[in-house]
């Protein structure tokens, strides 16, 4: 049974891990292998982000990942590519600050698709909300090296601000590791993304289990 948009967005509002592909850091494993391990370990949101492949390769990978996410009842969010999102029937698209504005993308995709926007500042958060984004990516919380030109860390203070004032769900991202995850949760984040910590792990399933344990222990406390 397919989820309504509101049910999908509930995943962003709850304590959750937001999975992200990053083949460059995956120790020789393919995006498909990594996504399968994430889904088998209970991750319900997958963002396909791949900057250095041809459009044809991205399309073919996305089709495979879409099938996997359907099997596991998970969401697929496509980074940057509005057309690719539509072609593979993904659940939504994630836009960077250099991409098209969310309000213009909404005109193309309509109300049923989820639109996320990367943000680094309070002004960008407020603009994303104003433009009708469904959620934001907030970061990098700590120093991060997954992007070619990383933004300076925004720190836990910004996470605290978003937890209090942001009117839509946010995903804390950037430099989050097993050892500092609890600090991010304490600052008010619920949905978190640990990119290289997961994809670069020797044992992805075991790593995700440890992360879930930290999240569940925090929820109980």
UniProtKB/Swiss-Prot annotation:
The reaction(s) this protein catalyses: 2-[(2R,5Z)-2-carboxy-4-methylthiazol-5(2H)-ylidene]ethyl phosphate + 4-amino-2-methyl-5-(diphosphooxymethyl)pyrimidine + 2 H(+) = thiamine phosphate + CO2 + diphosphate; 2-(2-carboxy-4-methylthiazol-5-yl)ethyl phosphate + 4-amino-2-methyl-5-(diphosphooxymethyl)pyrimidine + 2 H(+) = thiamine phosphate + CO2 + diphosphate; 4-methyl-5-(2-phosphooxyethyl)-thiazole + 4-amino-2-methyl-5-(diphosphooxymethyl)pyrimidine + H(+) = thiamine phosphate + diphosphate
Biological processes per GO annotation: thiamine biosynthetic process; thiamine diphosphate biosynthetic process
Protein keywords: Magnesium, Metal-binding, Thiamine biosynthesis, Transferase
Positions with a binding annotation for Mg(2+): 80, 99
EC numbers: 2.5.1.3
Manner of cofactor binding, per the entry note: Binds 1 Mg(2+) ion per subunit.
GO CC, alphabetical: cytoplasm
Keyword Magnesium on entry: yes
PANTHER family associated with the record: THIAMINE-PHOSPHATE PYROPHOSPHORYLASE, THIAMINE-PHOSPHATE SYNTHASE
Role, per record: Condenses 4-methyl-5-(beta-hydroxyethyl)thiazole monophosphate (THZ-P) and 2-methyl-4-amino-5-hydroxymethyl pyrimidine pyrophosphate (HMP-PP) to form thiamine monophosphate (TMP).
Name of this chain's protein: Thiamine-phosphate synthase
Source organism (scientific name): Caldicellulosiruptor saccharolyticus (strain ATCC 43494 / DSM 8903 / Tp8T 6331)
Classification lineage: Bacteria, Bacillati, Bacillota, Bacillota incertae sedis, Caldicellulosiruptorales
């Amino acid at each position: 049974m397919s989820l309504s948009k509101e049910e999908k967005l509930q995943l962003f509002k709850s304590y959750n891990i937001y999975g992200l592909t990053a083949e460059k850091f995956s120790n020789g494993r393919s995006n498909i292998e990594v996504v399968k391990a994430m889904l088998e370990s209970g991750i319900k949101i997958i963002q396909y982000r791949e900057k250095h492949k041809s459009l044809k390769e991205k399309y073919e990978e996305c089709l495979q990942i879409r099938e996997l996410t359907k099997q596991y009842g998970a969401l697929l969010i496509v980074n940057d590519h509005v057309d690719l999102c539509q072609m593979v029937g993904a659940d939504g698209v994630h836009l960077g600050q250099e991409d098209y504005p969310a309000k213009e993308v909404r005109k193309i995709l309509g109300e049923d698709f989820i639109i996320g926007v990367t943000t680094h500042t309070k002004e960008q958060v407020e603009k994303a909300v104003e433009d009708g984004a469904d959620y934001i990516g907030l970061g990098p919380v700590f120093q991060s090296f997954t992007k070619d030109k990383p933004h300076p860390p925004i720190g836990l203070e910004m996470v605290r601000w978003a937890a209090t004032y942001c009117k839509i769900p946010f995903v804390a991202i950037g430099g989050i590791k097993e050892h500092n995850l609890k600090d991010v949760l304490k600052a008010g984040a619920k949905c978190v993304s640990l990119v290289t910590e997961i994809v670069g792990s020797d044992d992805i399933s075991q790593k995700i289990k440890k992360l879930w344990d930290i999240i569940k222990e925090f929820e109980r406390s």
